[in-house]
Each structure stands twice: as C-alpha cells, then as structure tokens.
Amino acid sequence: MKSEELFTTAKTCLPGGVSSPVRAIKPYPFYVKSARGATLETEDGESLVDCCMGYGPLLLGHAHPAIQKAIEAQLDAGWLYGTPTKLEIDLAQRICRDHPSIEMLRCVSTGLEATLAAIRLARGFTGKCGIVKLEGGFHGAHDAVLIAAGSGATTHGTPDSLGVPPSFAAQTRQVPYNDPEALEELLSKDKEIAAFILEPVMGNVGPVLPDDGYLSAVREITKAHDVLLIFDEVITGYRVGIGGAQKKYGIKPDLTTLGKITGGGLPIGVFGGRRDIMELVSPSGGVYNAGTFNGNPLSMAAGIATNVYLHENESLYAELDEKTRAIEESLPAKASGSFVRLGSLFKYFFRSTAPRNYLEAKESDTAAFRVFFEKALKDGVFIPPSQFETNFLSTAHDASSMEKIISVYQHV
C-alpha cells in the first residue's frame, strides 16, 4: 500500500489518521517502512535524508549498531520483569555523574510523565500549587502545562485543549522567555508559586536561545523567592553535550527532566534533582509516582549503551556543530530569514532577525515555510513540518547526506 492509501485506511481507526498531531502532514503523510543511519525509506519507494531524527532522540542516527546490539542482548534476557534490575541503577548512576544537580532520580516512560511528576513533586515539596511556565513553552500534553501561549505574562492560564478544567489551568502562570523582569514582577506579587519550569533553550518553538545572563538571572530570582527551578532538558539533555544545557550555561536547577537521547531512542523519561526533594517521592515519601514500564530493561539497556558511546566519543559534539555551521554558511546572500543553531539543533526562521521568545517566533512567515518544507521534501530532505519545530542532525549524517541538506538550504 502507498502512503495515500494507508492514510485513507488510517483515518478509519486513528483520530485524524495519526498517533500524534505533528505527523498529520497535508494532504497526507508519507509512511516509513525502515530507517538506517540518516535515511528514511518510505512505503512509496523514496529515500529521504532525515533532519527530524524522531524529533530529537536519535543523536547517533537510526539503528546505530551499538544501540541495536544492546537491545538485542536484552531481548534475549527478557524485556519486562516487574522487578528492579541492575540496569536501572547503572543508568541512574551515569546520569547523576553527568549532571551535578541530579543527586537522585526516577526513570519513567516519557518526557511528558517526567514533567508531570516533577511538577507534582514541586507542589508536594513546597506545599504551594502555582506553576510558572514560558509563553509557548511545551512540556508534554498534560493539564498543568497545556496552557494557551501568548496570554499576558502575569495572568492566569487559559486552557489550550478541551477537557482541561479552567480551575486547574488557573494554577499556571506564564512569562516570556528572555524576560527576567517579568518573572521578578510575577514572583513578587504571587507568593503561591511552587516552581518555574522552562526549557533552558526553547526547543519546541525553534530553537530559541537564551540571552547572555538570562538563565543565571532566572536562577537568582527563583532562589530569592523560594521557588523551585525546573529545567526541562528532554530535548537538550545529551543533545547539546554531556551534562546538557545546565552544564553549558553553568546553571544548577533544583529539578531536571530528561528523555529522548537518554534512552537511546526507546521510550524514557527521567526526573531528578536535589536529594532532599527527591526523597519525597514514593515509596520513601508522600509524592506518588509509579508505572508498569518505569525503568524498563530495554530502555535502560539502550540508554546505557548510548551513554557509554557518548563518553567514548565526546568529540562528536564538536563535529556536529561544524555540520550545522556548514548549513548556515551555505545560505545564499539573498536569504532574508534568520538561521539559529546550537550544536546539532538548527532552524531557519522566515523572519529577518532571530526570535528571542515565542511571540517573536510567531511572527515568522509560515506560508513561506510551507513552500520551503514541500520543496525540501520533493528534493529528498525531510525537515519537521512546522516552522516551530527544531531540526536535528545526527552522527549518521555523512558527506552525502550533508550535501543534500546544504543543496536545499542554498535555495532557501
């Protein structure tokens, strides 16, 4: 079956024909039957250079031999026990070693679960209910953070989805990214805030990078107001380097969430942080968290294999940075947009200057992006189908795939 026919069938049994809205490419999505390295093979017989990489987890590319070997070995030993394993201890110790701010952690199954649990933990630890997030900040599709982007910086939240009770959404406040003054003003007025959760680098609208001094100001402000600081590093964790954005920018949050690369491309989420906070997690404390697939052996094995590989080949981060630099340098002189990159994350905004926050990112010409996306796909390069999703490179992007990508951006 070809993609168009598959989509017609999918709409009879899947809402909108897909399992996640971003995949609903118009007029119909292409369907992938296999992937290796940096290449997707579609049901239509096409080969595409992948600049999505599963929306971030595949730093080493599709079906990397070291990860595949670890998964196959664990399959032979069984893939779910319902008991503790040495694997979860091993991965936890590695993550704690890589992140000085993380003294204890809990492995869950998704980044969404990790942010949900971190917010619950912050509320339990502080005894306060309010949460602050960024305008446009995305932390998974759960009620505490599904709040409409762009509402006033110091107003209560408005539900961004049917089914979210307004009374629940009202516990969430928003401030703009790169605006420490707005955060200070809010926390000075509202003394019922448990935590401020943010992506240190906004990955779900860009990327959008922090101004010099912004993250350190956020750390000082939250400390001054006795508000916990949660870094959502589901995207940036192990993507911008071992130790994530918190190491790169020299910030020590109270809690951190991880996912994606941490599990080697298998389902995983992690929340961790200060020991005195984490000891409140059940069964040692009163903040409940549980899950059938928490710490599942397959994800632990893939995560360990990834961690080992990254430590043995840490120079790959500099090599990936050079690859995105090459894309940036390929842009034609007539290009009127802005190119933003950080290591292996990059995006071309159809906007004259790089955005500093979500509202500025929204000013991008989405119609022009759509034309660019469709041309790139026609030319054999798959980029995320939204102006507001980050592009990702992997170590598997070799000279041939880079040549294709650069050819696309030379004609932006």
Curated annotation (Swiss-Prot):
InterPro entries per UniProt: 4pyrrol_synth_GluAld_NH2Trfase, Aminotrans_3, Aminotrans_3_PPA_site, PyrdxlP-dep_Trfase, PyrdxlP-dep_Trfase_major, PyrdxlP-dep_Trfase_small
Keyword hit for Ligase: no
GO molecular function, one term: transaminase activity
Keywords (A to Z) from UniProt: Cytoplasm, Isomerase, Porphyrin biosynthesis, Pyridoxal phosphate
GO cellular component, one term: cytoplasm
Catalytic EC class: isomerase
Cofactor(s) required, per the database record: pyridoxal 5'-phosphate
Positions of post-translational N6-(pyridoxal phosphate)lysine modification: K260
Main location: cytoplasm
UniProt entry tagged with the keyword Cytoplasm: yes
Subcellular location: Cytoplasm
Catalyzed chemical reaction(s): (S)-4-amino-5-oxopentanoate = 5-aminolevulinate
This enzyme's EC code(s): 5.4.3.8
A Pfam family the protein falls into: Aminotran_3
HAMAP family referenced in this protein's UniProt entry, alphabetically: HemL_aminotrans_3
PANTHER family: GLUTAMATE-1-SEMIALDEHYDE 2,1-AMINOMUTASE, GLUTAMATE-1-SEMIALDEHYDE 2,1-AMINOMUTASE 1, CHLOROPLASTIC-RELATED
Family: Belongs to the class-III pyridoxal-phosphate-dependent aminotransferase family. HemL subfamily.
Name recorded for this polypeptide: Glutamate-1-semialdehyde 2,1-aminomutase
Species in which this protein is naturally found: Methanocorpusculum labreanum (strain ATCC 43576 / DSM 4855 / Z)
Gene: hemL
